[in-house]
Design a protein with these regions (language model features):
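Structured non-transmembrane domains adjacent to transmembrane bundles in polytopic membrane proteins
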Residues: 67-88, 96-184, 409-634, 666, ...
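Short beta-strand segments
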Residues: 92, 147, 275
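Short beta-strand segments at enzyme active-site cores
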Residues: 88-90, 128, 345, 741
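Short, conserved active-site loops that position catalytic residues or coordinate cofactors/metal ions
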Residues: 54, 88-89, 93
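Membrane-embedded transmembrane helical bundles of large multi-pass transporters/channels
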Residues: 1-57, 62, 122, 139, ...
Length: 787
């Protein structure tokens, strides 16, 4: 291979603070440490005081797809139909000994209806007694349910649910089972359990994390600093999100996702910085010099890692789903705050602590001497002797783990994500068992009826679609304007609706009141379909597709009928995500490539890093599908598989996993590059880089796994999926990728690792990562031709 000489000079005798922006920032934090610490204390105090009110500003929605049929139907039902409450609570009543025909049982139901109807925030209650509709009674007549319409905004509705549940159970005799379900009850319990799981995860993860940090640092002072940084980052971020939630819709998941990410990266970033600071002190630097050098090296790696994570999360903005964007905002915010704290607050604290960073040692633990050819140096040399064999073995493992990902199914979270003893889940299971799984999320079809829903021409259009639906085996029941009277013809229906709702027989009026917007022009007819399978099932999704693609056009209603409801919303959401996922992935990869190329002055290293991270993400996805969608981990992790992965998890996980995977890659490659610039020897640089970062990266990975596993141990399935996915991905990156693929691939690439065309090197902006070591001599590095 043709080579040419390239000289890279390291200035002699200059202070590290004079050679880099972060070095100068480090010098500033040393000189003004009390001002920096004071500013952070004030900021934390202010933000923490608002953080406690964040939950009240979060909503449960945001998963609707703008411009979709499902969203159009939802808005029409809310705005154009009288007494059609957008949110309801469903109260199930079951008596094993009596039926609804028993006066005593009926009295119980009527008493529940009266008490629930009197709860502030309940706009009305429908039941078998009030409507006479047989749809409210199970086939064995031992179960019925009531529908309570909730008024007010979303937070008011969620606050009303516990009162509805309490009123429903008040004074009910033993033997009568009363449960409260529905969307509002589901999200009320979801919020409460989410809050509890977050607190539990923090209580569990921090003590274990402290133990890991003590093993890594052998000093209580050094071990406490990363936890301090994580808590500060999280407290400031949650306070900031309180204000952001006041100007934009934020989903309830934002608290947990921000916490998962914030605790992990906050501790990791601090661990990298504290480790380097201690190394510089052991090299004989003064505290005043060690801080700027630390920021000029590990501080830069932290900033680059944070930027990569933020870039990856920013890809979620390409999907036009508000819930995704709110989770991205929360996670990006906590990463940005963690980076800012790691390069300002932490250096100020380190300058104050100084050599005390190594005090309060644990007697039984001894600090490991820096340098030398230890285990990881010898391991890297062994890998680089047979790179192809180790690459092949690692690839086989990663590909096998990724295989299940090919069969991934996305779905909206259902009641099964709640613990088995929660009332909304019990109510949903009762409804599914007695009335059909689809009753908890019926399909809603709105048909345009210009001139009035009760005209014969419009009734004929509605009837064609109704008959097509009744003939589909996936539908259990179909309610429409032409299905309320057995064996009635269109002429009879036309006479029935000739005078609008006012002309309908009073006994029949409750059954047809919601089947058209009678008091708002009667220009919309409604068809409600209960599916045989659950709303999130493939069978229900198939019915939505048939209605849209076959039944509506065949009925002559193309462009005049829209399909909504839970299944349609899930289908629209899944397809929006699937359609945008390639755009998100390519955008994140492209931006990450540019960022890494600017930092490492190489086109080969970014390609290697991206390829390895994609392999680790794919393996993590495959494990998530096997454990949660296939149900392999039900008994171990304590959940009930719904046969799908929650719809927001893959996209969110890609952004987080890709960004976090880069943490270790950037930290390792930064050290390898330092050694390469110092020695000009690629293999020696790889071995030394792996050796010098091994303990830190292993400790950081253990911290991450601890934090993520604590969230995986929670009670909500979506966060189990996220916590599990993040934990296994970190394990894969810290083991297969860092210890096998990186040294093997870099050995094969040789000097091409550092290749960049000279013209591009001049044109591309720099994010310098060179060491700030004052004592490093100038080195002459031979690079491949064309660099």
């Amino acid at each position: 291979m043709d080579t040419r000489e390239t000289t890279r000079e390291t200035p002699q005798g200059r202070s590290p603070a004079d050679r880099s922006l972060l070095g100068r920032l480090g010098s500033f934090t040393v000189r003004r440490r009390w001002w920096v610490i004071g500013a952070w204390v004030v900021l934390l105090a202010v933000m923490a005081s608002y953080a406690s009110g964040l939950t009240d500003r979060l909503g449960s929605g945001g998963f609707e797809v703008p411009g979709s049929q499902s969203l159009a139907v939802q808005r029409d039902l809310e705005q154009r139909f009288a007494n059609q409450f957008p949110t309801t609570a469903l109260v199930t009543v079951h008596d094993e000994a009596r039926t609804v025909d028993d006066p005593a049982f009926r009295a119980v139901v009527e008493g529940i209806a009266a008490r629930v109807g009197a709860v502030p925030g309940v706009g009305g209650v429908q039941s078998f007694s009030s409507t006479g509709s047989p749809a409210f009674v199970s086939p064995d007549r031992r179960t019925t349910y009531l529908v309570a319409g909730l008024t007010g905004d979303q937070n008011t509705q969620l606050e009303t649910v516990p009162e509805v549940a309490a009123a429903a159970r008040e004074g009910v005799a033993a033997g009568v089972e009363v449960e409260t379900g529905g969307a509002a009850a589901f999200y009320e319990r979801l919020n409460e359990i989410s809050r509890h799981d977050l607190e539990q995860a923090e209580r569990v993860s921090f003590p274990i994390t402290l133990i890991v940090l003590l093993l890594a640092f052998t000093s209580l002072v050094a071990a406490g600093l990363p936890i301090m940084l994580a808590l500060v980052s999280l407290g400031v971020t949650l306070g900031a999100l309180y204000f952001l939630a006041g100007v934009t819709d934020m989903n309830v998941y934002v608290t947990n996702t921000a916490s998962i990410v914030g605790i992990g990266v906050g501790i990791d970033y601090a661990l990298f910085v504290v480790t380097r600071f201690r190394e510089e002190l052991r090299r004989g630097r003064s505290v005043a010099d060690a801080v700027p050098v630390t920021l000029a090296t590990s501080g830069r790696a932290v900033a680059l890692s944070g930027a990569t994570v933020i870039v990856a999360l920013a890809g979620m903005f390409l999907v036009d789903i508000q819930a995704f964007r709110s989770m991205a905002i929360g996670s990006m915010s906590v990463v940005a705050v963690a980076v800012l704290a790691a390069i300002t607050l932490l250096p100020a604290v380190l300058s104050l602590v100084g050599h005390w960073v190594d005090r309060l040692r644990i007697p039984v633990l001894r600090p490991r001497a820096a340098g030398g050819e230890g285990f990881w140096h010898r391991w890297a040399v062994r890998i680089m002797r047979r790179p192809w064999a180790f690459i092949a073995a690692a690839l086989v493992v990663l590909v096998v783990l990724a295989v299940p990902f090919a069969g991934i199914r996305l779905g909206q979270p259902g009641a099964a994500i709640l613990p088995a003893d929660e009332s909304p889940r019990l109510a949903t299971e009762r409804l599914a068992a007695e009335f059909g799984a689809g009753v908890t999320g019926p399909m809603e079809i709105l048909v345009d009826t210009p001139g009035g829903a009760g005209t014969r021409a419009n009734l004929e259009r509605v009837d064609r679609l109704t008959r097509a639906l009744q003939g589909d085996e996936a539908a259990v029941s179909v309610q429409s304007l032409t299905s309320v009277l057995p064996r009635a013809g269109l002429d009879a229906y036309a006479r029935l609706y000739a005078g609008g709702l006012d002309g309908v027989d009073p006994e029949l009026a409750p059954a047809v009141a919601g089947l058209a917007n009678w008091d708002r022009g009667a220009d919309l007819a409604r068809i409600t379909v209960v599916t045989r399978e659950a709303p999130e099932s493939e069978a229900a999704e198939g019915l939505v597709d048939r209605v849209r693609d076959q039944y509506i056009p065949a009925a002559g209603l193309a462009g005049q009928a829209r399909v909504g409801g839970a299944t349609a919303n899930n289908l629209d959401l899944s397809r929006e995500i699937s359609g945008q996922l390639p755009v998100v992935v390519l955008s994140v990869l492209a931006l990450s490539f540019v960022l890494l190329a600017m930092a490492f002055r190489s086109l080969v290293l970014p390609l290697q890093a991206i390829a390895m991270n994609l392999l680790s993400v794919g393996a993590a996805y495959g494990l998530i599908v096997a454990v949660f969608q296939w149900g392999w981990g039900e008994s171990l992790l304590g959940f009930t598989s719904e046969g799908h992965i929650e719809v927001f998890v893959p996209l969110f996980l890609f952004s987080i996993l890709f960004g976090l995977s880069m943490d270790y890659e950037v930290f390792l490659l930064s050290r390898i590059r330092e050694e390469y610039l110092r020695t000009g020897d690629n293999e020696l640089a790889v071995a030394r880089g792996l050796e010098s970062t091994a303990r830190t990266i292993t400790s950081a990975a253990l911290v991450m796994v601890t934090v993520f596993a604590a969230f995986a141990a929670g009670r909500l399935v979506p966060f189990k999926e996220i916590g599990f996915g993040l934990a296994v991905a970190v394990l894969i990156v810290a083991t297969l990728v860092r210890t096998i693929l990186v040294p093997a691939v870099m050995r094969l690439a040789g000097r091409w690792n550092w290749w960049m065309p000279a013209w591009l090197d001049r044109w591309l902006p720099r994010i310098a990562l060179e060491t700030a070591d004052e004592d490093r001599p100038a080195t002459r590095v031979r690079e491949p031709a064309g660099a």
